Swiss-Prot record:
Changing residue 50 to A: Partial loss of sigma-G inhibition. Disruption phenotype: Premature expression of sigma-G factor (sigG or spoIIIG) activity during the early stages of forespore development. Spore formation continues normally. However its absence has deleterious effects on strain robustness and is strongly selected against in competitions experiments. An anti-sigma-G factor, prevents premature activation of sigma-G factor in the forespore; overexpression leads to 1000-fold reduction in spore formation, spore formation stops after engulfment. Overexpression also inhibits sigma-G transcription activation activity. When both Gin and sigma-G are expressed in E.coli Gin inhibits sigma-G, strongly suggesting Gin inhibits by direct physical interaction. Its cofactor is Zn(2+). GO terms for biological process: sporulation resulting in formation of a cellular spore. Keywords: Metal-binding, Sporulation, Transcription, Transcription regulation, Zinc. This is Anti-sigma-G factor Gin. Binds 0.5 mol of zinc/mol protein, probably 1 zinc per dimer. Changing residue 21 to C: Loss of most sigma-G inhibition. Changing residue 51 to A: Loss of most sigma-G inhibition, still slight interaction with sigma-G. It comes from Bacillus subtilis (strain 168). Changing residue 47 to A: No longer inhibits or interacts with sigma-G. It comes from the Bacteria.
Length: 64
């Protein structure tokens, strides 16, 4: 029996469950959204949407 467990994470941009992408601090960005963010021009209307979504990613506090 070959049982593969795939963990899905909720993308902070599209709010969909995906299993491929990157983690930034405590948030997840799916591969599709990562590619869209990288290829979007600053003059594109979608750029403001991506910036707003990415601003929800905060650096976790550092405790000593």
């Amino acid at each position: 029996m070959d049982e593969t467990v795939k963990l899905n994470h909720t993308c902070v941009i599209c709010d969909q469950e995906k299993n491929r992408g990157i983690h930034l601090y405590t948030k997840f960005i799916c591969l599709d959204c990562e590619r869209k963010v990288i290829s979007t021009s600053t003059s594109d209307p979608d750029y403001a949407f991506y910036v707003k979504k990415l601003k929800s990613i905060h650096t976790p506090p550092l405790y000593s």
